[in-house]
């Protein structure tokens, strides 16, 4: 008998079992479901009206689907659409809503890197707004943004990403392209 071949085969089997165990152990933690709800505030003059008086529920980071509509980019179970037309932040939100999506919530480093790679040299609105009453940035799902925004000033309550590879404050009334996001099917 060739003991070297048998031992090599056993080592390969053990490594496969260990690898599969780690995969099954960490898969739910990496791709676990996080449901959040968004309820817009109705304070005129602070940030744009997002969805009127309706509530919107969606899962911003998780989906096990793999199919996106034509013209959308797939990343980690989500579909992303980069508009070619420029609109105000409110009109960008409405544009995404008509496509069954929302402005992108860039809440992981992987998603940020992916969007920076596909956005090129353009600036795109995302779903991040400054809340002057709270003096903090919030995503449209009402979660707090813990990063930093460049060039924030009095009337720059919306955010773009793209050209500079950073989160840049922008006027909500200036026209930019937008990034829409929804679950893959």
UniProtKB/Swiss-Prot annotation:
Ranges in the topological domain labelled Cytoplasmic: 1-4
Name of this protein: C-type lectin domain family 5 member A
Keyword Iron: no
PANTHER family recorded: C-TYPE LECTIN DOMAIN FAMILY 5 MEMBER A (PTHR47536:SF1)
Tissue expression as described in the entry: Constitutively expressed in monocytes and macrophages.
CDD domains, A to Z: CLECT_NK_receptors_like
Residues the record marks as carrying a glycan: 35, 55, 90, 117, 141, 146
Modifications the protein undergoes after translation, according to the UniProt entry: N-glycosylated. Contains sialic acid residues.
Extracellular compartment spans: 28-185
Coiled coil regions, renumbered to chain: none
Miscellaneous field: Acts as a key regulator of synovial injury and bone erosion during autoimmune joint inflammation when its activation leads to enhanced recruitment of inflammatory macrophages and neutrophils to the joints.
Membrane topology, from the record: Single-pass type II membrane protein
GO biological process, one term: negative regulation of apoptotic process
Presence of keyword Cell membrane: yes
Positions of the C-type lectin domain: 75-181
Transmembrane segments: 5-27
Species this protein is from: Sus scrofa
Chief location category: membrane
